[in-house]
Amino acid sequence: MSVTLSRKLIDYVKLAKPKVVSLLDVVAIASYILAFKGNWYNLIPVLIGGSIAAGGSMIINGGLEIEKDKVMKRTSWRPTVKGEVGRKEAYMVGGIACALGSLIGLLANPLTAFFILLGSLVYVFVYSYYLKPRTWLNIVIGGFAGSAAAWAGYAAASNSFNLESLLLGLLVFAWTPGHFWALALRYKRDYANAEIPMLPAIVDDKTAARAIAISNILMIPFALGLMLYLNLIYVIITLAATAVLLYFNVRLMRNPTPEESWISYKFSAPYLAIVMIAAVISFIL
């Protein structure tokens, strides 16, 4: 019995995409610190609740996309594809996790719980269920799911939603398309075979590479908008990180290969973490 339970837990963790959740946690922590009002206790429920709810959303996503995951080499290993976690089981476990995570958020305040729940609802219903199989705008609009992590973290510390909080969320929103389009270009054939209309799967490689670069350029005003609240340290670190990101994007435009798109993708996740850490350093100093 213990072996079976252990196996199940491992399957759920795989479906929960811990790397994605950990990046959302970085966003939530940074947002919490930027809104810090002298109370560290609320960081615990927003981190635990947000992580559980985000993981639950990913598990539901695994149940929704079994057929598509089967034809994609990148996702063919998932427990839902192998039959180790059934569709209804994924819905049930994921749904419970989303509800539990939102309830834990209440230990901070109702606004935190609202944003945790909002993130789950946007990811599951708006992005995964409705937009992803229908339009290339899927990840553009779906980026608001990540924004909710910033808003939840900020709300947990301050019980408020203001311009600074909005900018943090919009930064994550604007970062999302370029990040996931780089991944989709790397696995373009997978997405095409699964009939998922990610932008790189429905346009030529050069157009996709330009779209990635343009998306990241459009992100810059949101990143620099935080200058209203932070000092020169944030500006210097953010500009340096952005220069590196755009350098990889230029390389990708010149040579739109799977290898170059993978390099852009692999840097874009640390990029967001770097910007968030820069914001924290700037705030503290």
UniProtKB/Swiss-Prot annotation:
Biological pathway: Porphyrin-containing compound metabolism; heme O biosynthesis; heme O from protoheme: step 1/1
Stored CDD domains: PT_UbiA_Cox10
Entry membrane topology: Multi-pass membrane protein
EC number(s) per entry: 2.5.1.141
One Pfam family named in its UniProt record: UbiA
Keywords: Cell membrane, Heme biosynthesis, Membrane, Transferase, Transmembrane, Transmembrane helix
GO molecular function: protoheme IX farnesyltransferase activity
HAMAP family from the UniProt entry: CyoE_CtaB
Protein name as annotated: Protoheme IX farnesyltransferase
Species, as recorded: Sulfolobus acidocaldarius (strain ATCC 33909 / DSM 639 / JCM 8929 / NBRC 15157 / NCIMB 11770)
Lineage: Archaea, Thermoproteota, Thermoprotei, Sulfolobales, Sulfolobaceae
Gene that specifies this protein: ctaB
